[in-house]
C-alpha cells in the first residue's frame, strides 16, 4: 500500500438530535451530528407503528373483487 494516501481514522464525537452523545471512530472529521440513534429510534424504543394494510386490501377486494374471479 502507498504511504500518505489513506485518510486518518480518528476518534469522533457523535451527537444525536435527542441529546445522546457517544464516541466512535471515523474518517469524517472530529464532530458528527446524526438524526436518530439507538436511544430514540422507534425500532429500539418499542414505539413502532404497525401499518394496517389489511383494511385497505379488504376494501379493494370488496370494490373490485368480482373482476378477478373466473366464471
UniProtKB/Swiss-Prot annotation:
Question: Which PROSITE patterns does this one have?
Answer: RIBOSOMAL_L31
| InterPro entries reported for this sequence | Ribosomal_bL28/bL31-like_sf, Ribosomal_bL31, Ribosomal_bL31_A, Ribosomal_bL31_sf
Instruction: Cite the binding residues for Zn(2+).
Output: 16, 18, 37, 40
> What SUPFAM superfamilies does the entry give?
L28p-like (SSF143800)
Signal sequence segment: none
Its GO CC terms are:
ribonucleoprotein complex; ribosome
Q: Which domain of life is it from?
A: Bacteria
* Names of the cofactor(s): Zn(2+)
Task: Write out the GO biological process terms.
Answer: translation
Cofactor binding comment, as recorded: Binds 1 zinc ion per subunit.
Which UniProt key words apply to this protein? Metal-binding, Ribonucleoprotein, Ribosomal protein, RNA-binding, rRNA-binding, Zinc
One molecular function GO term is: structural constituent of ribosome
Assigned protein family? Belongs to the bacterial ribosomal protein bL31 family. Type A subfamily.
- Biological function: Binds the 23S rRNA.
According to the record's subunit comment, the protein's assembly and interactions are: Part of the 50S ribosomal subunit.
**Protein name per its UniProtKB record:** Large ribosomal subunit protein bL31
Q: Which organism's genome codes for this protein? A: Pseudomonas putida (strain GB-1)
